[in-house]
Every structure is written in structure tokens, then in C-alpha cells.
Amino acid sequence: MKMTGWKKKLCRGHHLWALGCYMLLAVVALRLSLRLKCDVDSLDLESRDFQSQRCRDVLYKNLKLPAKRSINCSGITRGDQEAVVQALLDNLEVKKKRLPFTDTYYLNITRDCEQFKAQRKFIQFPLSKEELDFPIAYSMVVHEKIENFERLLRAVYAPQNIYCVHVDVKSPETFKEAVKAIISCFPNVFMASKLVPVVYASWSRVQADLNCMEDLLQSSVPWKYLLNTCGTDFPIKTNAEMVLALKMLNGKNSMESEIPSEYKKTRWKYRYEVTDRLSLTSKMKDPPPDNLPVFTGNAYFVASRAFVQHVLENPKSQRLIEWVKDTYSPDEHLWATLQRAPWMPGSVPYHPKYHISDMTAIARLVKWQGHEGDVSMGAPYAPCSGIHQRAICIYGVGDLHWILQNHHLLANKFDPRVDDNVLQCLEEYLRHKAIYGTEL
């Protein structure tokens, strides 16, 4: 009897042990299954698994950007003044402590591209089929501050998009090499085939974009729209939001285009010459070709592929391009004028009803010092919480809530040397929204 009881206990023990092992294996298999379903190398963008909360959590855990400072970004994006004040105070301390990443840092970290992309948390797969089917082209003109460039590229990067980078010929060699090292890690990012020395307010700024336009049109990527950026820009929309906004344009372009003031008209009254800087001459210019009225705007555009093709190929566009080459800051009236030219795809008539301000266009959100003031008294926006450079606000954390209320795709200017916290919070906001589709 004792032996029989012992055998029963032994059998019962083996049964419980086997059951426990089976349950453990089942849990491991379930976890492995969930992980496999969230494997970024074999994602089905339309599957329930990819859309599941569990999968999104796994993705966000792997792609969440590491916070450099303990600040309340959720509160800052909502306009919580206590969170803003704390971040501004924190920023004063950061200025004394944190130095931006150097050219050498990027030259070293990009020796192993996979490690670089993983460590810097680049999103290396499309986040939706809608984004996959609507590639965007970028013309990125840079000349300094390598960290600004890398963080901008990371923020706008998606593997289905295509990116042309133009580096100022005058930039230091170490900067050029660092840019080359970064873009060598991505098959869809390349250096412009022709580089020019960029002189402030001269034709060369336009030529840099034109060089990228030519290269991008030769790419096999079937991009739909072109956005141009500089080193102090940053997106304020996710790639998915950009795709939606561009689809809503339905082939139209979006850029500032207004009647010029008398002061602005002086920019194309006389010819300018370029050496190492732009110089005014006493030579008067002829009227613009084809009796085209000149409009004014800014350097930034959201342009359809057809618009870009006509910039480069249409004889009337080429005549206008030749005419503006010796004007002051031609990027601020060439695109604005082409946007009103009747032969340009996606343009609008030059009737006053079609004037469009920088606040109405979606290309770029900028705070101009001369327009800042009391919103309750009619000012378009409140004073800059950062500092000003050439009468333009370099944003601080106090501007972020306002920035995110606007419909623009990108904003200008940002500089981590001025306020790194606003960039950290914007990066965190965009990454969370890209993965979950919701705000912080």
C-alpha cells in the first residue's frame, strides 16, 4: 500500500511537472509568436498583427528616442506653462553642459552603418501602405552643424522616400566627409551630382535646389511631391500626415505667393553681382520675360512632380530663371512667380483672390520678429520664446504648443545650441505619433 501511494504521488508529481513545462512552453511560444509578428523585416502593413496595440508597443519600445533631459514633453506640447518654465530653466543648465555631436562623432559611428541606424533610431520600414504608395522627394541644402542635419534626416526619413543632399562647396572638409558618411548608410539618400558654393541671398541658393531637382527626376523612385529644406528646418508633421496633406493638394502646389511691397520690388530693379558676397550695381534690369508679373514669397515650396519638370524643361520657365539670376534673393520671388504662371502645373491665377501668405501655405512655419505681438490685439502670433536671427525666431520650448496647432509640414528655425529641449520634445512627439497615431 505504501509503495502504491508513493507511485501515485510520483505519477501525480510527474503530471504536474509536465503540465507546468507545457504551460511554460506555451507562454514562451506565444511571446515568440508576438515578437515574430512584429518582426520589422517581414511586416504585413495591412495585417491585424501590425495594427495591434501589442505590436505598436514593441515597435515604440525599439524606436523610442532616448531622452537627454528629464523634461515634461507631454505637458510642453499641450502648452502647460509650468512644464515650459521648468524646461526653460533646464535649458539654461544644458547650455553649460551639453555640446553638440561633432563631425568626428559621425565619422566614427557610421563605420558600422547598421549599428549607427539602430543606435540613432532611424525608422527603416514603411509604417503604412498609404505611405509606401506615396513616396516624397526631399532637396536638403546644408552647410554646417552636422547634428542638425542628422536629426532632420532622421525626423523625415522613410525608406520609400528619396533624399538629395546638397552641401555647400565652401563647407569644411570634415563636415562634407561627415555628411557623406551618414548618407552612405542609406540607399535612398545621395549627394547632389553637382555642388556649388552658396552665397547668402544670391542665385546659388536656387541653383542648389535645381541641381537636386535634376537628380531626383532621374531617380527610379516614383515620388509625387518635392519638399526643400535647409539645416535649421524640422518637420512638425509625421510622414503619414504629410502624405495625407499632399494627397489633399490633388496636384496643386503650396507656397507663399503675394504682391511685392515697394521695398521688395527694388530687389529686381538693378542687377547684382556675386563674388564672395552679393553686391548691388547701377545697371538697371529689363522687365521680366513674357509680361509675367513678379510675386514674392520665401525659399520654401511644396511642389508637384509635374511642376518640377516644368521648372527644368519649359522654355518660359527657363527664361524667367535666366532673368532672376542677377537679382537679390531670387529664391524669394522665383518660386512665388512660377506658382502664378499660367503654364505651370498646379499653379494658381495671378488674380489678387489667389494671393497666399506663408501662414496659409503649408510649406514652412516661420515667426517673423516684425509680426510678433499680442494675439488678442490682432498679432498673428505671440513673441518668440527663443532668440532671433535675421529677424526670424529660433524657437524655444514656449513656442512648441503654438507650432503644433498649425497646418504646415515643417517649421523654421531650430538650433540645439539655442534650445535643445524644444527639439527633444518635438522629436518625442513625432515619434510617438508616427507609431501610435496619437499625440503624447
Swiss-Prot record:
This is Beta-1,3-galactosyl-O-glycosyl-glycoprotein beta-1,6-N-acetylglucosaminyltransferase 3. It is found in: Golgi apparatus membrane. Glycosyltransferase that can synthesize all known mucin beta 6 N-acetylglucosaminides. Mediates core 2 and core 4 O-glycan branching, 2 important steps in mucin-type biosynthesis. Also has I-branching enzyme activity by converting linear into branched poly-N-acetyllactosaminoglycans, leading to introduce the blood group I antigen during embryonic development. Disulfide bonds join 73-230, 164-384, 185-212, 393-425. Residues 1-12 are cytoplasmic. It comes from Ovis aries. GO terms for cellular component: Golgi membrane. GO terms for molecular function: acetylgalactosaminyl-O-glycosyl-glycoprotein beta-1,6-N-acetylglucosaminyltransferase activity; beta-1,3-galactosyl-O-glycosyl-glycoprotein beta-1,6-N-acetylglucosaminyltransferase activity; N-acetyllactosaminide beta-1,6-N-acetylglucosaminyltransferase activity.
